């Protein structure tokens, strides 16, 4: 071949590599130096099949993807980051991520996913961050999370989660941040957070929580932040928070439906006296009931909540004492009356003999 032709071919290959056009999917941009394929905002309905095999990062956000088939990432074993946020994904097929053994970050936020397949986590043993926020999930099953053993951050916020299977997060030994705010949970059960000894932040804000079981947080040995604001709590059990055995845990409890009475004052008094528990928003906690205290800050009335109860107890105690004393006096009078009567009756025969 003529030297000039060879030279031109060499230049062409060099240009193709430099501009990242070699084996690049149509309507996407490829950057060989960073192994990055950018398909963001291209109105694509399917994940391209010709994504280069050496790709580390795929940005497929802001497209029209409606489902993720099992073959979507076939052969892309070197992938580290997959961004699929803000699409229209309604269904994730079984085995969809099974060919991504080195994946570290998966973003599925802002889609329409209503259910995770049972094998969702198969092949995701090295995943560090999973974002599923702003979807339509209603129930979490344990099988979907089984293999996320390296996960450090899980974002499930802004879904429709009403229930979770007991032990759903049990295999997530390295989890540090769990975001469950803005869902529809009503009861925090004791089995939800088993084995999460490394969890540092648990966000449960803006749910419909009315009750928390006593041992719900007992296994969280590293918890530094517990967010419970914006729920429907009226009362809480001191044992629920006393079971949190950490170096220091900050609590967020404002914007609930607190019934401000002596019981609540005593519980918060105990919590505030525990050295490792810190209610960061205590000054913003307000009363919802009783009606005469609605809207008042708890800190403004907490010292008075037990006064009325104490006064009532004193009145009851005084009434009981008066009743008891009156009964004793009456009994004593009756005793003396009966004694005098018996004495008079016993003198009758002697008087008649003397006469």
Predicted regions and their residues:
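Classical eukaryotic N-terminal signal peptides for Sec-dependent ER targeting/secretion
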Residues: 1-10
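Membrane-proximal C-terminal cap and juxtamembrane stalk of leucine-rich repeat ectodomains
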Residues: 3, 14-20, 24, 30-36, ...
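LRR N-terminal entry segment and analogous cap-like coil->beta motifs
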Residues: 32-88
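Conserved hydrophobic beta-strand positions in leucine-rich repeat
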Residues: 37, 56-60, 79-84, 103-108, ...
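The feature encodes a structural signal of leucine-rich repeats
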Residues: 44-49, 68-73, 93-95, 116-119, ...
């Amino acid at each position: 071949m003529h030297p000039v032709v060879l030279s031109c071919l060499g230049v062409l290959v060099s240009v193709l590599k430099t501009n990242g056009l070699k084996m690049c999917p149509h309507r996407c941009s490829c950057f060989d130096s960073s192994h990055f394929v950018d398909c963001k905002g291209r109105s694509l309905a399917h994940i391209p099949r010709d994504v280069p095999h050496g790709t580390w990062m795929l940005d497929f956000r802001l497209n029209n993807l409606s489902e993720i088939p099992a073959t979507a990432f076939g052969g892309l074993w070197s992938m580290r980051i997959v961004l699929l946020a803000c699409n229209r994904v309604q269904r994730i097929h079984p085995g969809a991520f099974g060919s991504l053994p080195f994946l570290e970050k998966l973003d599925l936020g802002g889609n329409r996913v209503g259910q995770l397949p049972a094998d969702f986590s198969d092949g995701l043993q090295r995943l560090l961050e999973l974002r599923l926020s702003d979807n339509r999930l209603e129930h979490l099953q344990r099988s979907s999370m089984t293999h996320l053993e390296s996960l450090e951050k899980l974002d499930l916020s802004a879904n429709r989660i009403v229930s979770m299977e007991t032990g759903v997060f049990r295999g997530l030994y390295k989890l540090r941040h769990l975001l469950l705010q803005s869902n529809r949970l009503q009861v925090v059960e004791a089995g939800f957070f088993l084995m999460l000894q490394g969890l540092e932040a648990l966000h449960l804000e803006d749910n419909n929580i009315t009750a928390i079981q006593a041992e719900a947080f007992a296994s969280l040995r590293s918890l530094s932040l517990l967010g419970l604001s914006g729920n429907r709590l009226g009362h809480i059990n001191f044992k629920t928070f006393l079971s949190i055995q950490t170096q220091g845990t900050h609590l967020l409890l404002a914007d609930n439906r607190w019934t401000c009475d002596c019981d609540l004052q005593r519980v918060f008094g105990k919590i505030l006296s525990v050295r490792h528990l810190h209610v960061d928003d205590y000054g913003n906690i307000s009363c919802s009931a009783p009606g005469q205290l609605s809207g008042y800050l708890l800190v403004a009335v907490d010292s008075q909540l037990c006064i009325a109860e104490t006064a009532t107890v004193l009145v009851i105690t005084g009434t009981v004492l008066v009743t008891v004393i009156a009964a004793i006096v009456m009994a004593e009078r009756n005793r003396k009356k009966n004694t005098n009567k018996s004495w008079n009756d016993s003198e009758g025969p002697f008087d008649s003999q003397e006469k």
